[in-house]
Amino acid sequence: ILKRLSGRGVRFVVDATGDLLKNVLKYKPFLVKPNHHELGDMFGVTTQTDDEIIEYSKKLQVLGAQNVLVSRASKGAMLIDADGKAHKIGNATGKLVNSVGCGDSMVAGFVAGCIEKGDYAYALKLGSACGNATAFSPELATKDEIINIFNTGFNSQKGVSL
């Protein structure tokens, strides 16, 4: 499918790992979203620090990824955007209820933020709010829960550019 769409101006997101992710990078996905363990595993290393995540995310960009969004469990998330700029955001304050769907919610929020504002820092914060709101809910989060976390849950974090 990606081969057929390549070169037609279609932007796509890949939330996959290992060889599957490596094999689609040549089609220049708009966004890939590994977690920090998956990112390290792809290169046979451990990625824990900001510098390590930036280094290996940029390697994914050299291979074709435009934006690399790395979820980091309790440490929040980092984004290396298509301009090569690194951003990070912590998690919102709340109680973990359910981790199922958090990554998918983060991706959806990030894409929505990019479409809405075209601003990577905003998209990272919205994606993180969606992922956190889902984590704090027994099911997928509601729009009101997401808005509340976006506005108050990060203690005024906007996403820090590194």
Where are these regions (language model features)?
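Conserved beta-alpha-beta core of the PfkB/ribokinase-like small-molecule kinase fold
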Residues: 1-51
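Conserved phosphate-binding/catalytic region of the ribokinase-like
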Residues: 3-8, 22-23, 50-162
